[in-house]
């Protein structure tokens, strides 16, 4: 099948309906059939079950339970240096670099707007103008829980409705504004080095996006942007330590981080296309 045909089918496919169906099937308890699908998936995508807290495929009552499986203790050591920002997920680096003229690189020759990514919030987008961004793609074989790259306090969460194009190199190179048009959950944190955004982007077959404080954010999908504000003082603050879980994908997609200007420097190990492991050095705080 040609690339043009694959992209054309992306536009024609009823992606939301397909994703709702996939979500229902993935959360259904179907006994031996669930186990058979899990075993096929492990073999097909070479999933390393040795690092799972429960490596037995038959222990998972639904496919979703398997997909968001916990890792055994110590499987992802967190870099303890306070000046180091750690990778939030097991993934592959898609793109990273400066936010120039309010634009992020989607793929070679393709850019999109930070303001659109953040749900159209011009004031919020201004906090990241001239800063840095990184886009991390989670493949089917990856661990699909997302963790905090640094100590932080949650300020705001924004649900941005949108499409559900598949996310992969082909769509990144051929679907304009891919990450700013797909459904997403934008999480804004305050840190010792300034504001940070951690954005969970949906895709076809991504049954749900969850956070540890709000649980399932989507589905259901909605027609309008929704915003939640959180206290920045008092007993009700939502604070995280580096390495703590903050969200997960039930079938999953992409994490995008935004950093304020002059706040971080990416680690020398960062390159487009390299695999990442949660907890390893991602960037360094600029003192």
Swiss-Prot record:
<dbReference type="GO" id="GO:0004609">
    <property type="term" value="F:phosphatidylserine decarboxylase activity"/>
</dbReference>
<keyword id="KW-0210">Decarboxylase</keyword>
<feature type="site" description="Cleavage (non-hydrolytic); by autocatalysis">
    <location>
        <begin position="252"/>
        <end position="253"/>
    </location>
</feature>
<feature type="active site" description="Charge relay system; for autoendoproteolytic cleavage activity">
    <location>
        <position position="147"/>
    </location>
</feature>
<dbReference type="GO" id="GO:0005886">
    <property type="term" value="C:plasma membrane"/>
</dbReference>
<keyword id="KW-0594">Phospholipid biosynthesis</keyword>
<feature type="active site" description="Charge relay system; for autoendoproteolytic cleavage activity">
    <location>
        <position position="90"/>
    </location>
</feature>
<comment type="subunit">
    <text>Heterodimer of a large membrane-associated beta subunit and a small pyruvoyl-containing alpha subunit.</text>
</comment>
<keyword id="KW-0865">Zymogen</keyword>
<feature type="active site" description="Schiff-base intermediate with substrate; via pyruvic acid; for decarboxylase activity">
    <location>
        <position position="253"/>
    </location>
</feature>
<comment type="function">
    <text>Catalyzes the formation of phosphatidylethanolamine (PtdEtn) from phosphatidylserine (PtdSer).</text>
</comment>
<dbReference type="InterPro" id="IPR033177">
    <property type="entry name" value="PSD-B"/>
</dbReference>
<dbReference type="InterPro" id="IPR033178">
    <property type="entry name" value="PSD_type1_pro"/>
</dbReference>
<keyword id="KW-0456">Lyase</keyword>
<feature type="modified residue" description="Pyruvic acid (Ser); by autocatalysis">
    <location>
        <position position="253"/>
    </location>
</feature>
<comment type="similarity">
    <text>Belongs to the phosphatidylserine decarboxylase family. PSD-B subfamily. Prokaryotic type I sub-subfamily.</text>
</comment>
<keyword id="KW-0472">Membrane</keyword>
<keyword id="KW-1003">Cell membrane</keyword>
<dbReference type="InterPro" id="IPR003817">
    <property type="entry name" value="PS_Dcarbxylase"/>
</dbReference>
<dbReference type="Pfam" id="PF02666">
    <property type="entry name" value="PS_Dcarbxylase"/>
</dbReference>
<comment type="pathway">
    <text>Phospholipid metabolism; phosphatidylethanolamine biosynthesis; phosphatidylethanolamine from CDP-diacylglycerol: step 2/2.</text>
</comment>
<keyword id="KW-1208">Phospholipid metabolism</keyword>
<keyword id="KW-0443">Lipid metabolism</keyword>
<keyword id="KW-0670">Pyruvate</keyword>
<keyword id="KW-0444">Lipid biosynthesis</keyword>
<dbReference type="GO" id="GO:0006646">
    <property type="term" value="P:phosphatidylethanolamine biosynthetic process"/>
</dbReference>
<protein>
    <recommendedName>
        <fullName>Phosphatidylserine decarboxylase proenzyme</fullName>
        <ecNumber>4.1.1.65</ecNumber>
    </recommendedName>
</protein>
<feature type="active site" description="Charge relay system; for autoendoproteolytic cleavage activity">
    <location>
        <position position="253"/>
    </location>
</feature>
């Amino acid at each position: 099948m040609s690339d043009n045909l694959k992209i054309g089918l992306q536009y024609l496919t009823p992606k939301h309906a397909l994703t709702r169906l996939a979500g229902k099937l993935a959360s259904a308890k179907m006994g031996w059939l669930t186990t058979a699908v899990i075993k096929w998936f492990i073999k097909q995508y070479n999933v390393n079950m040795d690092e799972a807290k429960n490596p037995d495929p038959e222990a998972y009552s639904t496919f979703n339970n398997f997909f968001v499986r916990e890792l055994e203790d110590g499987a992802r050591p967190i870099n303890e240096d306070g000046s180091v920002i750690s990778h939030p997920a097991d993934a592959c680096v898609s793109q990273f670099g400066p936010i120039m003229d309010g634009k992020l690189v989607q793929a070679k020759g393709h850019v999109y707007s930070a303001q659109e990514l953040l749900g159209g919030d011009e004031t919020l987008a201004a906090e990241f103008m001239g800063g840095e961004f990184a886009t991390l793609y989670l493949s089917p074989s990856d661990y699909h829980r997302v963790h905090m790259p640094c100590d932080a306090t949650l300020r705001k969460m924004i649900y941005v409705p949108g499409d559900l194009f598949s996310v992969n190199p082909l769509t990144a190179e051929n679907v304009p504004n891919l990450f700013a048009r797909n459904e997403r959950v934008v999480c804004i944190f305050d840190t010792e080095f300034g504001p940070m955004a951690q954005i969970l982007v949906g895709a076809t077959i991504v049954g749900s996006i969850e956070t540890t404080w709000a649980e399932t954010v989507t589905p259901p999908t909605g027609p309008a942007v929704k915003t939640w504000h959180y206290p920045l003082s008092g007993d009700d603050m939502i604070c995280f330590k580096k390495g703590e879980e903050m969200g997960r994908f039930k079938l999953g997609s992409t994490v995008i981080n935004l950093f304020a200007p002059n706040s971080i420097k990416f680690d020398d190990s960062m390159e487009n296309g390299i695999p990442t492991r949660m907890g390893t050095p991602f960037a360094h705080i600029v003192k």
